[in-house]
């Protein structure tokens, strides 16, 4: 009953709390050579003051983008600010969805493009030059969900001089655990008409192709242009797995 009461109070507070401004904007990325979108939440009163604000970069999950699924975050932020739980801050949600497998894993890839460099060298500079941020690592955080949680952890560790905080929600932090997906991958493949690995076999298959596009792309291997780290018997291909390991957050932290 207590949990229901608290949840009801949050709903009521969300309805009556001061509202920030949510915008979807685009800018040209020199790294990716295309116009890139992002959703930004500016705190209530942003246009009426000269105040500078901390910034949180929130990275979306696999199969999502900057405007789907996570819209409720803005209401939660407004509520927390209204009740004094947090100070006002800016939240930026960049779009790193990409074809053909729906997610870049915030990684530089010959197949997808250099999305790590896009975040680090293009997006942050654009946001700091366009909005009244506090351009200091102690006032810049990075977080995300699922694939975004992985990306936030990896980028936060690699570029600790840029970020003062890292938060990961359901992100893959240790790649050794990814081998637990192999039975599901093989099960999905068993239902394939040809008994072959295909991204259309199921979600785990799509995820494995997506991750392979980030960590082990092979532009000389049509039609999928990736090297999967698993063979037809469900055994790990060590030479491909070794290409994944430099992107393992645990390994990055240890280095």
Placement of each model-derived feature along the sequence:
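Sec-dependent N-terminal signal peptides
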Residues: 3-18
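Non-catalytic cap/lid and distal C-terminal segments of serine-dependent acyl enzymes
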Residues: 19-255
């Amino acid at each position: 009953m207590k949990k229901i009461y608290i949840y009801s109070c949050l709903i009521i507070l969300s309805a009556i709390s001061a509202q920030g401004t949510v915008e979807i904007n685009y800018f040209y990325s020199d790294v990716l050579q295309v116009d890139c979108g992002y959703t930004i939440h500016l705190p209530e009163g942003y246009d009426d003051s000269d105040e500078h604000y901390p910034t949180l970069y929130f990275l979306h999950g696999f199969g999502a983008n900057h405007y789907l699924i996570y819209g409720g975050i803005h209401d939660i932020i407004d509520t927390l600010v209204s009740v004094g739980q947090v100070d006002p801050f800016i939240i930026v949600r960049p779009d790193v969805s990409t074809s053909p497998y729906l997610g870049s894993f915030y990684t530089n890839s010959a197949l997808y493009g250099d999305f790590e460099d896009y975040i680090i060298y293009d997006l942050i500079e654009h946001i700091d030059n366009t909005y009244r941020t506090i351009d200091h690592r102690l006032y810049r955080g990075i977080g995300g969900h699922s694939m975004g949680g992985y990306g936030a952890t990896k980028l936060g560790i690699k570029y600790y001089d840029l970020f003062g905080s890292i938060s990961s929600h359901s992100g893959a932090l240790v790649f050794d655990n990814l081998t637990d997906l192999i039975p599901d991958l093989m099960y999905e493949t068993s239902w394939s008409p040809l008994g072959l690995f295909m991204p259309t076999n199921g979600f785990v298959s799509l995820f494995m192709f997506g991750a392979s596009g980030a960590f082990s792309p092979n532009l000389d291997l049509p039609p999928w242009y990736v090297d999967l780290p698993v063979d037809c018997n469900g055994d790990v291909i060590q030479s491909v797995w070794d290409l994944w390991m430099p992107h393992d957050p645990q390994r990055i932290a240890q280095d």
